[in-house]
Amino acid sequence: MPDTPLTPARRHVAPDDALVAPARAPFVELGLVTCFSFLRGASDPVDLVLAAHRLGYDAMGVADANSMAGVVRVHGEARALGVRPVIGCRIETTEGLAFLAYPTDRAAYGRLCRLISAGRMVRLDGEWQAKGVCEIDLALLAAHAEGIHLALLPPRDLGETFTIEAESNVIPLPLAGG
């Protein structure tokens, strides 16, 4: 008797040659979290792409927490439906800030991946990182930020103070286009 697989077969969006890509949408989601963000996202990339297409989005931005884990599946599924994937992630810093981070080119994509790897491999004090933990501070983010569009996210509680304490209160980030 053959063994049944322990995991179900992965679902995919079936390509359709008659499919017309959505027109330019006035609004698209940029901070979508997939099921690859443990205890945060519940939706499989297939479901997110199907929902984006159904809502008429011409693009969708994936932003898993300190991870690029969902981007490959989102990219493949989105292309099948004519939805442009905006590839990035949500960077959460040790200072308590969160940024949507979207690389502008291949080199910036590499820097973003190296930033995440650095945060996952070594703690800020130089010791090896515990599994599943990612420590990225603003200085580390600034060192890898060239060519990456960063959007600072407000706190969940808008009554919270939206500032951080820093030694000099200034963390230099590279300017766009300069």
Language-model segment annotations:
Residues 1-178:
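Phosphodiester-processing cores and adjacent nucleic acid-binding clamps
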